């Protein structure tokens, strides 16, 4: 109750099968192996600036369908050495709370519901981010180490620089350190492609941080909906892959769009405008 903190720590697995709740304090759940979270095992802070810090230091995190992590104004961080199968993350306050999901292997979404409701969302995977991940956020950044990034956003969104911090509790259940993650824009490695779309009729996209696909990775950015715009304020580049930029209304290009040998396809239902700082280059492609 109140602002009391909660620390759950195990030298093996942790199975969350009942609600873990703090009125306004911080929660740390730290397992040396795996963490599983059932639909009855919601984890939540109910007020103030309390954060949620959950980590499987030697294994995976498995959130079953219906499992929820929520912080009423604070931030959330889930980290695993291996895969993270995601459920629902909700910071309730879109202006303050951010979510960070960091997987040593893959970030996996097994349903078609919106997975993350927050101000900012940071995704980082040693493997892929896929299925796709459905979001309802204001700002987003993501990085894949060896595969594709697939994200569908439910509203207007900025691809941005994100820094997410949570409080790590020590053995006395007091804050012992601040854990922070940082990502800038959308980045795929090892020939991974990037697919970032808003749902039909739902949102504009503002590219306020670089979008970069390694080697032959392709890039698709698509803003869907009447009056929805794709605005390119930072560079969109791939090594030798293809770039497709689509908008149901306008595309505004204030930056470089570049590939070395691939093709660039830019289509807008209303208009495409390039400012003086806009440049499109294929370096031998189409």
Q: For the regions a protein language model found, what residue spans apply to each?
A:
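Extracellular lectin-like interaction modules
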Residues: 1-286
């Amino acid at each position: 109750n109140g602002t009391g903190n909660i620390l759950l720590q195990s030298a093996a697995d942790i199975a969350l099968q009942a609600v873990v709740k703090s009125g306004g304090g911080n929660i740390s759940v730290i397992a040396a192996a795996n963490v599983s979270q059932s639909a009855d095992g919601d984890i939540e802070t109910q007020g103030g600036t309390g954060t949620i810090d959950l980590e499987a230091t030697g294994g995976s995190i498995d959130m079953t369908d219906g499992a929820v992590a929520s912080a009423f104004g604070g931030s959330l961080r889930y980290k695993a050495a291996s895969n993270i199968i995601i459920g629902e993350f909700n910071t309730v306050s879109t202006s303050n709370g951010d979510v960070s999901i960091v997987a040593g292997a893959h970030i996996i979404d097994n349903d078609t519901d919106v997975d993350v409701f927050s101000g900012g969302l940071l995704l980082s995977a040693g493997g892929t981010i896929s299925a796709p991940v459905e979001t309802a956020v204001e700002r987003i950044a993501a990085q894949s180490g060896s595969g594709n990034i697939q994200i569908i956003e439910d509203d207007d969104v900025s691809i941005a620089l994100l820094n997410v911090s949570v409080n790590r509790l020590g053995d006395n259940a007091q804050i012992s350190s601040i854990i922070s993650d940082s990502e800038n824009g959308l980045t795929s490695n090892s020939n991974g492609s990037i697919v970032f779309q808003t749902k039909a009729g739902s949102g504009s996209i503002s590219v306020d941080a670089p979008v970069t696909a390694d080697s032959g990775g392709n890039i698709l950015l698509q803003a869907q909906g009447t009056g929805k715009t794709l605005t390119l304020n930072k560079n969109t580049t791939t090594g030798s892959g293809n770039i497709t930029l689509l908008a149901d209304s306008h595309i505004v290009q204030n930056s470089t769009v570049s590939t070395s040998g691939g093709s660039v396809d830019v289509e807008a239902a209303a208009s495409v405008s390039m400012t003086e700082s806009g440049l499109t280059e294929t370096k031998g492609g189409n």
